[in-house]
Amino acid sequence: MPMQGAQRKLLGSLNSTPTATSNLGLAANHTGAPCLEVSIPDGLFLSLGLVSLVENVLVVAAIAKNRNLHSSMYCFICCLALSDLLVSGSNMLETAVILLLETGALATRTSVVQQLHNTINVLTCSSMLCSLCFLGAIAVDRYISIFYALRYHSIMTLPRAQRAIAAIWVASVLSSTLFITYYDHAAVLLCLVVFFLAMLVLMAVLYVHMLARACQHAHGIIRLHKRQTPAHQAFGLRGAATLTILLGIFFLCWGPFFLHLTLVVFCPQHLTCSCIFKNFKVFLTLIICNTIIDPLIYAFRSQELRRTLKEVLCSW
């Protein structure tokens, strides 16, 4: 298994990252000019992964325990937690295996190591795709619940949600297998980037439309009760702030990784791009951070889920 940087991680085509020498320092590019390189200690990376793992396991356990949470909306949230769990778990597994290989605690044939590496890469890629898909699915579910409130339960039935979930998992596994097999083709990386942009646009359009409807509804209530307009403005500002945080976190955590893939396609040998490639593990760490934040945004805001979570913790 490769030993450092992107060679240690997803997509073997990103194999230009050299060994980091400090936690935060200046590394030299091909011309000797300094470029900023941030090294994430393995201990910190594993710790963040463990936090994400525990957090998402609790979400899955709480939803599985409470039958009142067995609705289409919570099914999507549960699958988001499961995919986030796999994202953090697969990265932790690969990091742990590499550390064992480096220390000599794990000795095996090169072919076995390479097969394990490919399997982990497929798991990582498919769980990332699933995570993005379920973020989009949650946005669609909330959009339908607002704009088709009276028909929501007939549109988003549990069997229909289960079929959508199965389709997402199957498509993600098949796609990731193809992506890892043909990782050295630029079209593969571009497909991943386009998919991320499509999810970003989908979420932005749906949530902005939902915010506009919520502001319109609040304005109607204010007019009905003959209140002053500052209340409506305050509601609009709170909604805009919430939307900015939601989309901002998504973009900041996932964007650098897909920017990295874009640069691999368009400027693999450029000096500036080579400096960015050195921080590949930072981009993966941001994705792990997103898997920690997702439950706070989508799961723990539910009072019913928090109550069930307390029961789960007390039962242990």
Curated annotation (Swiss-Prot):
It is a multi-pass membrane protein. GO terms for biological process: adenylate cyclase-activating G protein-coupled receptor signaling pathway. Residues 64-72, 141-163, 212-240, 301-316 are cytoplasmic. The chain crosses the membrane at residues 38-63, 73-93, 119-140, 164-183, 192-211, 241-266, 280-300. Keywords: Cell membrane, G-protein coupled receptor, Glycoprotein, Lipoprotein, Membrane, Palmitate, Receptor, Transducer, Transmembrane, Transmembrane helix. It is found in: Cell membrane. One of its GO terms (cellular component) is plasma membrane. The keyword Disulfide bond does not apply. Belongs to the G-protein coupled receptor 1 family. This is Melanocyte-stimulating hormone receptor. It comes from Saguinus geoffroyi (Geoffroy's tamarin). The gene is MC1R.
